[in-house]
């Protein structure tokens, strides 16, 4: 497990995302849960982002702690997310976690899939 807490982090975890995760964990009443972000093949642009809650941190996972909650990324996914930012938005279009990814050369209209 690798944990970094300075500006050299390969991926950022915004306050908005951390605050939302904290609220969801309080609803679940399980402080052991962490937000895991991952990349899989699929979607209309070749790769897609996924988000899930996970109690486990695997060997080699990258973790960031903010607002008392953790974001976890597996090593394979991290290579596609370096320089990116995990954020949360809520508005007229709904509420969702999303990734701002500078490595994505194209994205689909909803922002859930990308290509590099």
UniProtKB/Swiss-Prot annotation:
Gene3D superfamilies: HesB-like domain. Pfam families: Fe-S_biosyn. SUPFAM superfamilies: HesB-like domain (SSF89360). Binds 1 iron-sulfur cluster per subunit. Signal peptide: none annotated. InterPro entries: FeS_biogenesis (IPR000361), FeS_cluster_insertion (IPR016092), FeS_cluster_insertion_CS (IPR017870), FeS_cluster_insertion_RrpA (IPR023063), HesB-like_dom_sf (IPR035903). Iron-sulfur cluster binds at residues 44, 108, 110. Its cofactor is iron-sulfur cluster. GO terms for molecular function: 2 iron, 2 sulfur cluster binding; 4 iron, 4 sulfur cluster binding; iron ion binding. Keywords: Iron, Iron-sulfur, Metal-binding. One of its GO terms (biological process) is iron-sulfur cluster assembly. One of its GO terms (cellular component) is cytosol. The keyword Iron-sulfur applies. Belongs to the HesB/IscA family. Homodimer. Required for insertion of 4Fe-4S clusters for at least IspG. PANTHER family: IRON-SULFUR CLUSTER ASSEMBLY 2 HOMOLOG, MITOCHONDRIAL. This is Iron-sulfur cluster insertion protein ErpA. It comes from Shewanella frigidimarina (strain NCIMB 400). The gene is erpA.
């Amino acid at each position: 497990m690798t944990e970094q807490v300075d500006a050299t982090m390969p991926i950022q975890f915004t306050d908005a995302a951390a605050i939302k995760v904290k609220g969801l964990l309080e609803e679940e009443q399980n402080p052991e849960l962490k937000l895991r972000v991952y990349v899989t093949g699929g979607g209309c642009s070749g790769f897609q982002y996924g988000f899930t809650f996970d109690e486990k941190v695997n060997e080699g996972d990258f973790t960031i702690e903010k607002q008392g909650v953790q974001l976890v990324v597996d090593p394979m996914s991290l290579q596609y997310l370096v320089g990116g930012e995990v954020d949360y938005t809520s508005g007229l279009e709904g509420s969702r976690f999303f990734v701002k990814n500078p490595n994505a050369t194209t994205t689909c209209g909803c922002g859930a899939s990308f290509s590099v």
